[in-house]
Amino acid sequence: MKNEEKDKRYVYIRVRDICIIGVIIIVLSLLWNFRDKVETLLLNNHNEAKYIAISSLPFNSNGKINYLDKDGKTVKVVNKDLYRGYRYIEHNGDMYISNKDNNILKIGKDGSLKDFEIIKKDIFKKDNRGIYVDRMCIDNDKMYMTHSLVGKTDIYVKDMTGQEEGKKLTEIPYDIRNMCIIKDEIILTADRFEDLVNIKSDIIILDKNTGKIKKVSKHDEYIETYNMRKDNENNIYVETLKRRLTDEELDKPKKENNELYDRYISKLNIYNNTIEDIVVDGKKLMGNLLRVEDKNMYAYDDKEDKFKVIDLKENKEVFSEKIDGYIRSTYFKDDKLYMNIGTKDKTYMYIYDVKTNKIIEKKEFKVDENRDNTIFPIT
């Protein structure tokens, strides 16, 4: 009789433990699935959202999108698969982010979020290499994307209106690093390695509709891979890196300035195969090309640690100010340039007013300081 009672008690305990474990799993699952709402509820901040911070960690996809009030305090949290190396472009006030395989995240200027596939899943499964977007460009409601492979690049096109399915436009035998669109042509830059130190660039022109190569031109300059901008008149501006140290100088003990390249901002003429220096106040323009809007070019001079505004019509500098940090991103809205500036442990927003040629506001945001943050305003 005692053995039967022991057996019953043992079964009862096992069933109870299984039920408890099951309840814990269900609760944890619910908390995970609704973690956005739980985090937002715990914030207890009901202010209106004025900014969005895209936050990512260096080594995994545990990303977040934080909605911030006017003082930079978080009012809402959305967890997303965002890697540190994500790509983004801004178009008509909306942000488009390549945040995972075969996926683009659209962050609307009103703060709305929308995921969409590059191509249909059934087509996507046929290509087991996956699609990881390197560069994006939007023209007439169509997004063009590059996916670099070893020694070649696939180019995809996606109709943003949803009237047509996404498709692979072409595959070309070049390692594409950047692109922009001029009228009916896709302008691409590709690296050409002569050796480990000497890198030069090819310019490839494709037909935007067919993907066929129309022209390839080779340049002695190395066109920096990440920054390529065009103005309203379809002039193309790039960064060019020119060697400043010889092979013999590289073998010598380190000097105070041992950078291999000097960085210049240049104008690219794709039709006569020339790269022209931009001369401002008698000096060749150096530094990082941030963006071009209307007649103004926005640049960061890393030698002087200064943000600069260049009037391209007058070829003169109209603004210059020291920036204590790294300019992570820029966003243009209502004649104002919003600059997201990061330091080792802080994140700032500088707002430059085009009409007055002044930085009219500087904000500090205390949000996920151990992450990489990209912040921009919402309407």
Model-derived segments and their meaning:
Residues 44-60, 87-105, 134-149, 184-197, ...:
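Short beta-strand elements that form the blades of beta-propeller/WD-repeat-like
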Residues 31-37, 59-83, 100-129, 149-171, ...:
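Surface-exposed loop/turn elements that mediate protein-protein interactions on large endomembrane-trafficking
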Residues 6, 131-134, 157, 266, ...:
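Low-complexity, repetitive regions of proteins mediating host interaction that are extracellular
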